[in-house]
Curated annotation (Swiss-Prot):
PANTHER family: OXOGLUTARATE/IRON-DEPENDENT DIOXYGENASE (PTHR47991). This is Thebaine 6-O-demethylase. PROSITE patterns: FE2OG_OXY. GO terms for molecular function: (S)-tetrahydroprotoberberine N-methyltransferase activity; metal ion binding; thebaine 6-O-demethylase activity. Keywords: Alkaloid metabolism, Dioxygenase, Iron, Metal-binding, Methyltransferase, Oxidoreductase, Transferase. Neopinone spontaneously rearranges to the more stable codeinone. 2-oxoglutarate binds at Y223, R305, S307. Its EC number is 1.14.11.31, 2.1.1.-. Disruption phenotype: Accumulation of upstream metabolites, such as thebaine, but reduced production of morphine. Lower levels of sanguinarine and 1-benzylisoquinoline laudanosine and, to some extent, of noscapine and papaverine in roots but increased accumulation of the protopine alkaloids cryptopine, protopine and allocryptopine, and of the protoberberines sinactine, N-methystylopine, N-methylcanadine and rhoeadine N-methylporphyroxine. Disulfide bonds: none annotated.
Amino acid sequence: MEKAKLMKLGNGMEIPSVQELAKLTLAEIPSRYVCANENLLLPMGASVINDHETIPVIDIENLLSPEPIIGKLELDRLHFACKEWGFFQVVNHGVDASLVDSVKSEIQGFFNLSMDEKTKYEQEDGDVEGFGQGFIESEDQTLDWADIFMMFTLPLHLRKPHLFSKLPVPLRETIESYSSEMKKLSMVLFNKMEKALQVQAAEIKGMSEVFIDGTQAMRMNYYPPCPQPNLAIGLTSHSDFGGLTILLQINEVEGLQIKREGTWIAVKPLPNAFVVNVGDILEIMTNGIYHSVDHRAVVNSTNERLSIATFHDPSLESVIGPISSLITPETPALFKSGSTYGDLVEECKTRKLDGKSFLDSMRI
């Protein structure tokens, strides 16, 4: 029986490329991709809702409006979205449509490369960056039905020479421009969140510096068609680890779901929009005012799905904990302080994706 080509992970393991597996037209998926029931089935009485209008939508033009009433209304919407949902879409964001189109076509082009070409970017020993899969900690761990390409893009000194500089020139130049635009958009959101949270003036500079000099990473995701989509998962349910994630859907195939009050809600990306979500670190910094949310990616039997997630996180040297002005006698600290972001990153490298397990470990 023909076998899929293997890709080497940074921990020394070798696993099949799911994109290559899908080319074999299997009747059944390999056992390592069969999820435990609790990862697939909904809680008793829960359902999947396909109404994307339940997801808040933030208009960046209104958020930046010089008209005080318009700006305040949109700021209130942003605050509500972060408190009550942890997920929202942004429209009128100012990112040039031609750049977004280039991102989509170049990422599609990368995954269309031959396996031999893609493995030139495979993960090196002890590293999570590169082509492969993430969060694989054991030989018997259930695998996601996806291939990914992960790399740090900011600050510049974190870019790996064997990855970023070796990308095909059109992809590298496109990612370079996209990285800059995502950084600008993230800082608009962080600055407005500070205002909505009424962070005291003495702390605003310190909070902004955590992210203005912070890290940015990108993860390109490829979810091929799956012969048994009811048994597999594209991306295991989890909350994101860092500050803010900005997601761009590459094609028209849906798959992102978020968990709200025991219900999985299917997110339908709006045209010319990004999906944004709060991460665990931002929940810690806001002392639980803003919430990170469990989400997952599901797969289907007929169509491939692609996306790119851009993660905006603190600088590695930043000490993580609740912002002091958000701690009061009525709202005591909910999370531990004192660890640097870099230390927490190293700790998370040893974890598999598992809901909000990291955040739970940080609770007081």
